[in-house]
Amino acid sequence: MKHPNSLSLRRRVALELWRKRMDIAVKEHPLRQLFWECTQRCNLHCRHCGSDCRAEVGVADMPLADFSRVLDSVALRTDPNRVFVVVTGGEPLMRHDIAECGAAIYERGFPWGMVTNALALTPLKFQSLLDAGIHSMTVSLDGIGDDHNWMRGNPDSFRMVDRAIDMLVAHPEVKFDVLTCVNRRNYGNLDDIKQFLVKKGVKQWRVVAVFPVGRAAADPMMRLMPAEYRGILDFIKQTRKEGAIPHQLRL
């Protein structure tokens, strides 16, 4: 008698082929993403910052020439078109040469993107990034109005990220997502954030919990309760059923 949980021959073969592909991938471990922390400086003072970034730090930005040599070395070993360079910080827009950096990455055949708080993302700066071949961007939104400003420590933060989202929606050639860090203050307003993003035309939204390091480690407002973690999961489940906006979830 066939066991109810047994696999068919076809499925067993497919599973074995998948396992072999995974074994090869683990052994080869091909490079697919390269993160460049191009600066430790930041123009905000976020409550949850894991690196305690500030406007002025004692560490100089990595020179573009140095990172260019890294890229040239990587290009000798792998296809640049298959390695996505993610420019992070600190806040990448603190660098006066950020567009030049992006152009240097793009000219070497690497697709690239940026993670930004959008405070310094003016239309002129955004155009310079487009001219430099930017492929993608992640911007942060942790609430509507004062909720976001409270999290980011700046009264202009919400206004600027609101404008940044509008600019990104108007340029569909740039893939982008919005990142929301859930905390005790904005937990009850996730539906408001969702409705705001849907009306804006946002297609990708990442909802994450705050990792308790850096400033977040000493801030009780960043520590979710077990019931709140469960509530996030229920919220994601319901939102996925609605289908209004795609989701990614990381806890």
Map each language-model feature to its residues.
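Conserved alpha-helical substructure of the radical SAM core
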Residues: 2-136, 224-228
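Radical SAM enzyme [4Fe-4S]-AdoMet core and its adjacent flexible, acidic
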Residues: 1, 132, 136, 140-142, ...
